[in-house]
Amino acid sequence: MKIQLVAVGTRMPDWVETGFKEYQRRFPRDMALELVEIPAGKRGKNADIARILQKEGELMLAAIPKGNHIVSLDLPGKNLTTPQLAEQMNKWLLDGRDVSLLIGGPEGLSPECKKAAAQSWCLSALTLPHPLVRVIVAESLYRGWSINNNHPYHRE
């Protein structure tokens, strides 16, 4: 199974790239973690946010291979504990499809992305910086994988 992280934003600080790549490299070949970056729309004083969201959404959906299971990372989504995430990852694996996780820009995800998602996952009720979310998601997925594979990374 491949897990594709589709995220708005292309110029991340070095610590974000380093953190994401650290967890990405830990995954085994049969469960690859891939990052697809979508250019953020230009936001200015008089920017048309609805139009920016629509364009970002179109680019995100175009980046997802047909047949992928789509999960939005969004505030009204479901909060998962680490064991619940591990269980969800097992379900995705049994489903036999690759998974695309969507991380929106500063204003979130477009309505089209939310509609296309079969599931919605909420990391926190807190507002998190979008660059940090990439690292948190990568670590959380790796921790879920480690539980499912009896790897000593996760401890109760």
Swiss-Prot record:
SUPFAM superfamilies: alpha/beta knot. PANTHER family: METHYLTRANSFERASE, RIBOSOMAL RNA LARGE SUBUNIT METHYLTRANSFERASE H. One of its GO terms (molecular function) is rRNA (pseudouridine-N3-)-methyltransferase activity. S-adenosyl-L-methionine binds at L73, G104, L123, S124, A125, L126, T127, L128. It comes from Shewanella pealeana (strain ATCC 700345 / ANG-SQ1). It comes from the Bacteria. The keyword S-adenosyl-L-methionine applies. Belongs to the RNA methyltransferase RlmH family. It is found in: Cytoplasm. Its EC number is 2.1.1.177. Pfam families: SPOUT_MTase. Specifically methylates the pseudouridine at position 1915 (m3Psi1915) in 23S rRNA. It catalyses: pseudouridine(1915) in 23S rRNA + S-adenosyl-L-methionine = N(3)-methylpseudouridine(1915) in 23S rRNA + S-adenosyl-L-homocysteine + H(+). This is Ribosomal RNA large subunit methyltransferase H. The lineage of its organism: Bacteria, Pseudomonadati, Pseudomonadota, Gammaproteobacteria, Alteromonadales. Homodimer. It is an enzyme of class 2 (transferase). GO terms for cellular component: cytoplasm. Keywords: Cytoplasm, Methyltransferase, rRNA processing, S-adenosyl-L-methionine, Transferase. Its main location: cytoplasm. CDD domains: RlmH-like. HAMAP family: 23SrRNA_methyltr_H.
